């Protein structure tokens, strides 16, 4: 049995009309992950619905409602092999009302491909594109490549490609802390497959890698196995004859049968009996594994989604308050002391109150612009002190980055995103 290729999780981000789903569909098809017969069937279906050209995107848009609307809603996971990796695609939704999915989706990615429409050079960078790139950066994705798509609509013009590339570098990438010189840009036409898996003869002026080769050039993630165990709970099931089975993804550390564990902020203590993934028992599970596990001594009513599992010797931190660096993405008015929106951190959703606005920063450089500002508005970056209204596990990004990041939502939109830089633990 040949050793399995390492898995690389790649998020596809960008504006809804940039052709992300088509790009992903093309990678899956040319990568041999889709039966070509399926594409023929979907093509017919797309033509009947008056959406010819959407057939690749149909592959990702599994849900019927999504097919009708032509919008990707839930985060879809699909796999295809490249020369080096088994790539799992995290296709992140583009529409603003699905940004929450984007936040939970992007945090599972090792690298991101930003898909942009070459035509945006004329209309300017879409706000959604900015938000996705910024969120990816905040969520800790340090590897990024850019696919400049729909090159067929500008006759594969090198000038248009260069204009878009420069605009992205100057007006977006530098601002959020990516160095454009270290980022690979690829001119693609996903609908026809140009430079996706196969080199295109229509871009003789481009001698860089294809999109599949760019993915192969990403570095594999280092699993944070040496950090303390942290496993945010997604769901809790009660299975007859087995008992309580919490489900979640190991973020850091290692979990195995026999471990003495604690759920915080619930405070429930138990012992791991079994660990399972895809209905198979495991001797242990490590970061990235989505598992179900059986715990002795803990009932279904004792724990819930948003609790975090750790070892009793190093329990998760329940925050009395925390200091965070945030960036305000959008807000109809201003944020002031006393503002209490909902924080989405790991699997928890808890309202937190702004206790202090300590510093306003330059979002591009991090330098302090103002001490103790009176308010924050869209586009501002800041250091703030926050207090959860209910018990919440939060870790400092310096210690356990996977549990230090969050998004702030209000009025049905993501108003800000950030990370905890210092956490004051609650006294028991």
From Swiss-Prot:
GTP binds at residues 14-21, 91-95, 149-152. It catalyses: GTP + H2O = GDP + phosphate + H(+). Pfam families: GTP-eEF1A_C, GTP_EFTU, GTP_EFTU_D2, GTP_EFTU_D4. Keywords: Cytoplasm, Elongation factor, GTP-binding, Hydrolase, Magnesium, Metal-binding, Nucleotide-binding, Protein biosynthesis. Residues 149-152 are annotated as: G4. One of its GO terms (molecular function) is translation elongation factor activity. Residues 14-21 are annotated as: G1. It comes from the Archaea. Residues 91-94 are annotated as: G3. It is found in: Cytoplasm. It is an enzyme of class 3 (hydrolase). Residues 70-74 are annotated as: G2. Coiled coil: none annotated. GO terms for cellular component: cytoplasm. PANTHER family: TRANSLATION FACTOR (PTHR23115). NCBIfam families: EF-1_alpha (TIGR00483), PRK12317.1 (NF008969), small_GTP (TIGR00231). GTP hydrolase that promotes the GTP-dependent binding of aminoacyl-tRNA to the A-site of ribosomes during protein biosynthesis. This is Elongation factor 1-alpha. The gene is tuf.
